[in-house]
Amino acid sequence: MHVVLAGGGTAGHIEPALTLAEALRRRDVGVGITLLGSPRGLETRLVPARGFDLALIPAVPLPRRLTPDLLAVPSRLRAAVGEVERILAETGADVLVGFGGYVALPGYLAARRTGLPYVVHEANARPGLANRWGARFTRYVAVADAAIRLPHAVPLGIPLRREIATLDRAARRAEARAYFGLDAEAPTLAVAGGSQGARSINRAVVAALPMLAAAGVQVLHIAGPQQIAEVESAQPKRAPDAPAYVLLPYADRMDLVYAAADLMLCRAGALTCAELAAVGLPAVYVPLPHGNGEQRLNAKPIVEAGGGVLLRDAELRGDAIRRIVLPLVTDRARLAEMAGRAAALGRRDADERLADLVEQAAAARRVVT
């Protein structure tokens, strides 16, 4: 069996695709796997590092508004679909799996044109255009949650890396804090703005560092590769005996980040929400203020269950860290209660369930052919 995965662009698309690839390979070491991506996406680094083949196609951004860029979409899409068709033929693909994003729509179109079965996986509470279109023409549609409305949808969750899906935070806490050079006992706030970073979150945290230090809170700050220089230059002077402040551009070991943290301050991407629920880590979610509002909807079930707090991006310009984050990160009893409520919503086996669906789709093709 050969599987082609279309999930490039951001970590929220790439990581579930890679996790599915690993689940398929655990079942059959001989399975062929090719990931589709674009030359400018994170996949150019992440996919080879995990040992899988990467095939690059032209990205086809779909403007949300009427702009001159819309005029270029048809020609770009034709070129990308043609390239995917070539890859499907060269690999002898049995099934394609799309995760939304810039490379998914060309993948779905190429699969449909060539009669190849394909699987759609939608992680976001509000599906994007590629998956809304793709779900109309296949029986194999998986969604993160039953509330996500797509044709033929089966709620399976979001595939999570094994080290996260199997994480015992309490058992790994000492190891994780030592790994990052953090104190073993101090209240610990982890900050992450997604794979590209978040300027508003970064600026608010840097401004609040003296206050957090005065309260004995140590900070593990993943600023994003595009934001790291700005954060480094804006840091205030710190006393030699101040609680630890660890600044990173990117974290490849998010399992250890989650094990080290008492509380996350983060965006509300679908993958982030799924991971935090699965490991039972309370969070203050700051959804992206633009887009189609899917990040707020991603966090909504966790917040309503009491496993997280929702904070508007605009509130970061005020004293939200003093009012909301600081009292929470130092309240162990409340954090423990929130952890349990978040964990009750977590799903840890979505990789295996999605692998079942992929094998079902591939088997249907073999029966037909």
From Swiss-Prot:
UniProt catalytic activity: di-trans,octa-cis-undecaprenyl diphospho-N-acetyl-alpha-D-muramoyl-L-alanyl-D-glutamyl-meso-2,6-diaminopimeloyl-D-alanyl-D-alanine + UDP-N-acetyl-alpha-D-glucosamine = di-trans,octa-cis-undecaprenyl diphospho-[N-acetyl-alpha-D-glucosaminyl-(1->4)]-N-acetyl-alpha-D-muramoyl-L-alanyl-D-glutamyl-meso-2,6-diaminopimeloyl-D-alanyl-D-alanine + UDP + H(+)
EC number: 2.4.1.227
Alphabetized UniProt keyword annotations: Cell cycle, Cell division, Cell membrane, Cell shape, Cell wall biogenesis/degradation, Glycosyltransferase, Membrane, Peptidoglycan synthesis, Transferase
Enzyme type, top EC level: transferase
GO biological process: carbohydrate metabolic process; cell division; cell wall organization; lipid glycosylation; peptidoglycan biosynthetic process; regulation of cell shape
Membrane-topology annotation of the record: Peripheral membrane protein
Pfam families to which the protein is assigned, alphabetical: Glyco_tran_28_C, Glyco_transf_28
Main subcellular location of this protein, as a coarse class: membrane
Listed CDD domains: GT28_MurG (cd03785)
Superkingdom of the source species: Bacteria
GO molecular function: UDP-N-acetyl-D-glucosamine:N-acetylmuramoyl-L-alanyl-D-glutamyl-meso-2,6-diaminopimelyl-D-alanyl-D-alanine-diphosphoundecaprenol 4-beta-N-acetylglucosaminlytransferase activity; undecaprenyldiphospho-muramoylpentapeptide beta-N-acetylglucosaminyltransferase activity
Residues the entry annotates as binding UDP-N-acetyl-alpha-D-glucosamine: 10-12, 124, 161, 195, 295
Pathway in which the depicted protein is active: Cell wall biogenesis; peptidoglycan biosynthesis
GO cellular component: plasma membrane
Subcellular location(s) of the protein: Cell membrane
InterPro entries, per the entry: GlcNAc_MurG, Glyco_trans_28_C, GlycoTrans_28_N
Entries under NCBIfam families matching the protein: murG
Main function: Cell wall formation. Catalyzes the transfer of a GlcNAc subunit on undecaprenyl-pyrophosphoryl-MurNAc-pentapeptide (lipid intermediate I) to form undecaprenyl-pyrophosphoryl-MurNAc-(pentapeptide)GlcNAc (lipid intermediate II).
Protein's UniProt name: UDP-N-acetylglucosamine--N-acetylmuramyl-(pentapeptide) pyrophosphoryl-undecaprenol N-acetylglucosamine transferase
Gene behind this protein: murG
